[in-house]
Amino acid sequence: MEYLIRTARITDIERLVALSDDVVRVSRDAGPLGPTDLLRQLVYLPTASVFVAEARRDVVGGAVLALRPSVVAGGFAGTVDLLVVDPDHDIDRVTDALLDEVVRSAQNKGCSVVEAVLPTDPAARTRWERHGFVESGPRTELHVAAVGAGASRGR
């Protein structure tokens, strides 16, 4: 099965929230906006990118990349705030496709590092490591070169 990765549309948000229910359940009471409202806003913000994975026009996964300036990183840092995959689909392939797009987007936006919360599941950690992410304290990160800056990331 082929998986298409594309930028999320506002109409994708309900499905993305449904897929991420276990992940975002904790955050429902954390702030004034629920996950659905926040993701809807992120679709339009220039400091965030929301991606979905599609199979036969069904959303089967998604990822959120949030950007922030970082003096320590020497430019922008991209944070993979959310990455979810429908368990009925090929988790490895969908995760790989989403991470490829997230890293490409981070490089295009001038990020010098991409970070994420360190996965506790060994299989999930292996999927991230295949993309070059390494443990860095309580988080995992991948140093990337911004487009036009010379060296690119290695695998």
Could you describe each region identified by the protein language model?
Residues 106-118:
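Conserved GNAT acetyl-CoA-binding A-motif
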Residues 85, 91-104, 130:
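Conserved acetyl-CoA-binding loop-helix of GNAT-fold acetyltransferases
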Residues 87-90, 115-126, 143-146:
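Conserved beta-strand-loop-alpha-helix junction that forms the acyl-donor binding cleft
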Residues 52, 58-67, 84:
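Conserved beta-strand in the GNAT
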Residues 18-31, 71:
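Helix-loop element at the rim of GNAT/NAT acetyltransferase active sites that forms part
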Residues 29-50:
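Active-site rim helix/loop that mediates acceptor-substrate recognition in acyltransferases
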Residues 74-87:
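Conserved acetyl-CoA binding element of GNAT-fold acetyltransferases
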Residues 1-14, 148-155:
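Conserved N-terminal entry element of GNAT/NAT acetyltransferase domains
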